[in-house]
């Protein structure tokens, strides 16, 4: 969710997730990822942007993404109001992801400016 939000905000030149959901938005403390995406969607569309699509690539060994890929794509797409694709890969046992210590996500967003 963080990578998705950062990608959309960056593509719109509207800052990043820290700027948008910073300490000045205490109402978002503890909010679900879906609530964050919906608030982001409403904000960028109010600015006149159209979110065309978002691509997420998850890098890590665990958890396995494929069994729930379709579910993730459907839930994220519904919240964003635009197609979200999810791909997964490993880092061939290299680095912190290869040691199973975490994952990272690369996100790209295509938006149409007003």
Residue ranges and their predicted role:
Residues 1-75:
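RNase III-family endoribonuclease catalytic core
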């Amino acid at each position: 969710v963080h990578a998705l939000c950062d990608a959309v905000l960056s593509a719109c030149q509207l800052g990043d997730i820290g700027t948008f959901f910073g300490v000045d938005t205490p109402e978002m403390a503890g909010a679900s990822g879906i609530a964050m995406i919906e608030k982001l969607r409403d904000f960028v569309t109010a600015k006149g942007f159209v979110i065309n699509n978002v691509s997420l690539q998850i890098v890590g060994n665990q958890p396995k993404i494929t069994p729930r890929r379709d579910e993730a794509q459907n839930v994220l797409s519904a919240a964003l109001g635009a197609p979200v694709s999810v791909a997964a890969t490993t880092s061939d046992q290299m680095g912190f992801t290869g040691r199973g210590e975490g994952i990272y996500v690369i996100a790209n967003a295509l938006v149409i400016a007003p």
